[in-house]
């Protein structure tokens, strides 16, 4: 896959005018030959290389690493039974798709790992597990438990095997991993764009995915489960794939209602997002210095509509 970077003016994406804090974004467009063109923009040119907090967008990266690791190493099968503290039938894929029944936070956080669900008002301090496959409880605990399982199988800390599995092959050299596989990535928007570009054009990429591989990765897991999408409230069908969100019919949402239901993505409480429309050949990414709040909720749907429109116009 050839990735070519260019720059954008404010007029290309008018919704940018509403952001009064440091940010950087990327627009990706897949061409007919499989190459991916990337245009970037930022509040200041220096912010294009600035490492921003990804927070929960980390889950998107880690999910890709799990999928690749499961294809390359059958010992890390996503159908591995998890065991305690989950119900007997819960598998690794159920952790990644947030249908294990576990609460948002681990009951006892490790030193240096804050209970973010409590901190952000998403979860109660006394939250308990429920029966699996009855409700989709978005959960950092799921990813941290999955990361611990992978460490035992692979024999390396999650930071190391995710770096070797995804970051190094894609040249995501500015991204640093620490703390938690649910929220611990910090890096520039160019790295996030490289990740999105790999999923836009996998068969010309470097991770070895086929389109069929990604069809499996993006397939809905236990569709129809209601649940709370942090920042956006209750959803009748809080649709998820293997560690990445599916747009589905969620509303309200950071993606506009005009987006197809099969678009995958993730957003983070740091004010970050990534999404990939594999069918249309368009993708977008955003990182910023202001925590997710009213300005993001107000502007992101329009911004993402403009990103997708621009990406489609640029196709050759």
Report residues per predicted region.
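Short, charged, amphipathic alpha-helices and their helix-cap/turn boundaries
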Residues: 25, 29-40, 94-97, 102-132, ...
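Well-ordered alpha-helical segments within folded domains of soluble proteins
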Residues: 60-63, 141-147, 190-194
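Solvent-exposed loop/turn segments at secondary-structure junctions
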Residues: 102, 143, 290-292
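Amphipathic, well-packed alpha-helical segments that form the structural scaffold of globular domains
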Residues: 125-127, 147, 197
């Amino acid at each position: 896959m050839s990735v070519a970077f260019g720059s954008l003016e404010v007029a290309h994406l008018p919704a940018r005018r509403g952001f009064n804090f440091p940010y950087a974004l990327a627009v990706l467009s897949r061409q007919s030959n499989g190459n991916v063109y990337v245009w970037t923009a930022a509040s200041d040119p220096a912010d294009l290389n600035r490492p921003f907090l990804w927070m929960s967008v980390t889950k998107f990266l880690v999910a890709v690493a799990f999928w690749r690791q499961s294809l390359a190493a059958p010992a890390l099968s996503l159908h591995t039974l998890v065991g305690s503290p989950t119900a007997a039938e819960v598998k690794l894929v159920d952790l990644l798709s947030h249908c294990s029944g576990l609460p948002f936070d681990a009951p006892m956080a490790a030193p240096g790992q804050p209970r973010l669900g409590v901190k952000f008002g998403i979860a109660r301090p006394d939250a308990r597990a429920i029966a699996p496959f009855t409700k989709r409880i978005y959960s950092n605990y799921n990813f941290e438990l999955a990361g611990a399982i992978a460490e035992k199988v692979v024999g390396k800390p999650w930071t190391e095997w995710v770096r070797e599995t995804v970051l190094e092959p894609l040249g995501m050299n500015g991204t640093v991993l620490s703390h938690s596989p649910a929220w611990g990535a910090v890096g520039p928007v160019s790295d996030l764009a490289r990740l999105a570009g790999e999923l836009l054009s996998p068969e010309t990429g470097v991770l070895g995915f086929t389109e069929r591989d990604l069809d499996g990765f993006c397939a809905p897991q236990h569709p129809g489960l209601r649940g709370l999408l942090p920042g956006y409230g209750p959803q009748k069908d809080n649709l998820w794939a293997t560690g990445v969100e599916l747009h589905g019919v969620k509303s309200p949402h950071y993606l506009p209602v005009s987006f197809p239901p099969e678009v995958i993505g993730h957003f983070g409480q740091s004010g970050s997002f990534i999404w990939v429309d594999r069918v249309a050949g368009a993708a977008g990414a955003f990182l910023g210095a202001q925590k997710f709040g009213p300005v993001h909720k107000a502007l992101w749907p329009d911004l993402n509509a403009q990103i997708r429109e621009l990406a489609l116009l640029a196709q050759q």
